[in-house]
């Protein structure tokens, strides 16, 4: 297990303490973002397994609840873009429009399906134009439950002789609480039943919202990650009339507040190195230093190899699906002192970290 987790877990009961000395800092950790979706459809057991086999010690598992209160791995509760649900006539009447975190969305939603119903669906590639090779896997794998991911993690840990862990992310917390189907109690219960609600357990909980993390800091013994974005505000802030934004959370004062309930900052990478008007990497901000000064570890998201996601000067061609100079981007961010990163191609990120 990497040093990042060990320091984070120790800080779970004292997140506001000073950052560790340089000599205590470990090799930056690579988290498989939704598994290894550069190679397999995201959030499938196959995607998670590949990430672990490529060398990632952690995988990012976004969680949303089903109608019958089970936690499944999906990036959002609308599943039209990542499953074959539209091809199931028996579910045609489930298509609807909802407002999720202030945004109208039309499609099919996990909270309207039982787990048994969701298990009849199959995962599909989210961005087939960018990752056409992944289309061959459409229809191969079911939607995974978090319990299934935990079981896979334990099994592969034994096989690979490594301690492997999960980064569960609570999606749309305020929304699910508003419809009487909150995620947090289900997650706390699941961790407890798996013996994972304890210090040094291989679990780190994430959220883009704040109130739920503050509450969880009193309910769990594992580290917490405050996720932030380069734009916008936490959904719970908007719902409660709090005028603060993610930019406010990224100030020294905001980071100090985060350190009272969380151990990690998970910023959008543009908050660390913004891009210029021309789309190239700009000048790094002070966010990494400021977060370290507040006693927080910094694990930004998301690094991807395809030209479509890279700075303009690091692209290899006009084809958005071609791989560009991902190493140059990774090297630039690693030079800022980040403690880890989320990557769609964990194998590439691990080469950057270790070379």
PLM regions with names:
Residues 5-355:
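Phosphate-group recognition and catalysis centered on beta-loop-alpha active-site segments
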């Amino acid at each position: 297990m990497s040093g990042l987790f060990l320091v984070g877990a120790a800080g779970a009961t004292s997140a506001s303490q000073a950052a560790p000395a340089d000599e205590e800092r470990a090799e930056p950790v690579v988290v498989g973002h939704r598994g290894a979706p550069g190679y397999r459809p995201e959030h499938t057991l196959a995607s998670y397994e590949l990430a672990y086999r490529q060398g990632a010690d952690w995988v990012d598992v976004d969680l949303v609840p089903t109608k019958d209160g089970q936690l499944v791995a999906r990036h959002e509760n609308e599943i039209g873009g990542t499953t074959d649900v539209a091809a199931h006539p028996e579910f045609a009447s489930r298509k609807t429009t909802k407002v999720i975190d202030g945004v109208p969305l039309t499609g099919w939603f996990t909270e309207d399906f039982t787990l048994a119903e969701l298990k009849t669906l199959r995962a599909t590639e989210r961005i087939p134009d960018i990752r056409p090779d992944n289309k061959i896997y459409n229809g191969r794998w079911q939607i995974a439950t978090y319990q299934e991911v935990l079981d896979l993690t334990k099994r592969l840990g034994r096989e690979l002789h490594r301690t492997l862990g999960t980064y569960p992310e609570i999606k749309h917390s305020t929304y699910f609480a508003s419809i009487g189907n909150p995620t947090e109690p289900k997650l706390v219960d699941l961790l407890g039943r798996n013996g994972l609600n304890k210090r040094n357990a291989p679990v780190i909980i994430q959220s883009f919202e704040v109130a739920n993390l503050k509450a969880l800091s009193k309910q769990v013994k594992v580290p917490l990650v405050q996720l932030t974005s380069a734009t916008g505000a936490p959904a719970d802030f908007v719902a409660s009339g709090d005028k603060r934004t993610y930019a406010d959370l990224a100030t020294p004062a905001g980071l100090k507040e985060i350190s009272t309930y969380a151990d990690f900052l998970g910023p959008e990478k543009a908050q660390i190195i913004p891009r210029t008007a021309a789309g190239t990497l700009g000048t790094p901000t002070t966010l990494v230093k400021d977060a370290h000064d507040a006693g927080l570890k910094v694990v930004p998201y998301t690094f991807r190899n395809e030209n479509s996601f890279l700075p303009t000067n690091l692209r290899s061609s006009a084809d958005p699906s071609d791989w560009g100079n991902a190493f140059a981007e990774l090297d630039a961010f690693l030079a800022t002192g980040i403690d880890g990163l989320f990557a769609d191609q964990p194998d590439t990120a691990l080469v950057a970290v270790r070379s």
